[in-house]
Amino acid sequence: MGRKFFVGGNWKCNGTTDQVEKIVKTLNEGQVPPSDVVEVVVSPPYVFLPVVKSQLRQEFHVAAQNCWVKKGGAFTGEVSAEMLVNLGVPWVILGHSERRALLGESNEFVGDKVAYALSQGLKVIACVGETLEQREAGSTMDVVAAQTKAIAEKIKDWSNVVVAYEPVWAIGTGKVATPAQAQEVHASLRDWLKTNASPEVAESTRIIYGGSVTAANCKELAAQPDVDGFLVGGASLKPEFIDIINAATVKSA
């Protein structure tokens, strides 16, 4: 059984009620491959999760953009995994580079978050990736392996984890890793999983690419053997997200 193509849309801190309803309408009307070819998950801000979930076409799912590292309680401003489960939200994005950089989330903290979210029944899009300085220093795989190791040390079952490789230098900058650069890191990550988790985990875990994915570059990226989908930022707020979802047909062709 091959790895089903996965396309996530991270709306980040964007949107009004009107804008969200327009995006959902576009998604609902878009012509996309069937759900046995591609899995689609969109991640609106917390406040819009219920409305998006209730209005979105049935075969698409929603993800939260974060959740707290343990059970809820006296943690003002946080949202717990239990609350997301209670709302019927199946997915959560954890370890996004913006949270690592702006909010100081460490590899260990992200590992704890992933483990707790999984323990409560959520599926996780776990983000890893290097900065431009780290890439230029030749330490891309060291950085990505350390981030992945912090997760691997806390979990045994990878069946509900999608790994998103997002080179920080390519997020929202218009710069994009070349298909060859993306493939190189994805293949190295899969090798790391083979050695440090198991060959089965390496074979079955989807590794998706994020970082200035557009309708123009998605098909070439999707053609890479170890690129199993995308985590899309800015383009997920636009009609071109439908084109990106359709890149899944490259794999099934």
Swiss-Prot record:
Its EC number is 5.3.1.1. InterPro entries: Aldolase_TIM, TIM_sf, TrioseP_Isoase_bac/euk, Triosephosphate_isomerase, Triosephosphate_isomerase_AS. PROSITE patterns: TIM_1, TIM_2. Substrate binds at residues 10, 12. This is Triosephosphate isomerase, cytosolic. It comes from the Eukaryota. It is found in: Cytoplasm. It is an enzyme of class 5 (isomerase).
